[in-house]
C-alpha cells in the first residue's frame, strides 16, 4: 500500500512509536526487535507506552489520558526535526498519542499513525495516516484482537522493509543479527558455510572472530 511505503520511507530516520495499552506494547515489541534481528542501535526505533515500562505488564490508571506526557517523554529523549513520530491507536483518540503528535508537527517533525478508525483525531495530526478497516472485534471494544493483529503486521512491514533498504538483510537472511545464544551462532555459522563453502569449524571460528555473518563474509573476501 502506498501509505505503508510512505511510512517506511519516514522510518529511515530515527523513529518513535507511541501508544497506550496493546498499541503501546506492540510498538515497544517491534522497536525492541531491531537491535537483535538487524544489528542496529536501539536508538533507531524507540517504543514509548503511556505509563512507562510498568504499563507493559500492568494497567497504569489514567496514563493514556495525559495529553502532555507524550511530548514530555519525546523531549526527554532529545527528539529533533530529523526524527519521526508514529502514533498507534485502534480508536485514533488516545490523548497521550495525539498530544505528542500535535506538538511534534508544531516543531516541524514528520508524523504518521496506524489506526482502525477512519477520520480520527489522531489521523488529523498525521502527515501519513494508515487507516486499516478491520470490522467489529469478536469481543466488542477489545482492540487487542483484530486491530492489534493488524497493527503488528503493519509494523512488521514497515521496519522489515526499512532494514532491507538499509542493507541489513541479504536475500532473506539475518546477516547482521546479534549472536546472543548458541542457536544464533549455529544459524550464522550455517549461513557462512552456505555462502563461502567452508567447513563448519572454520565458518564458526570466522563468525566468532568478526561478530556477524556480514562482517565475517566481507572480511574473508577481502
Predicted feature locations:
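Single conserved hydrophobic/aromatic residue that forms the stacking wall/gate
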Residues: 1-8, 12
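Short, amphipathic alpha-helical interaction segments embedded in low-complexity terminal/linker regions
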Residues: 162-222
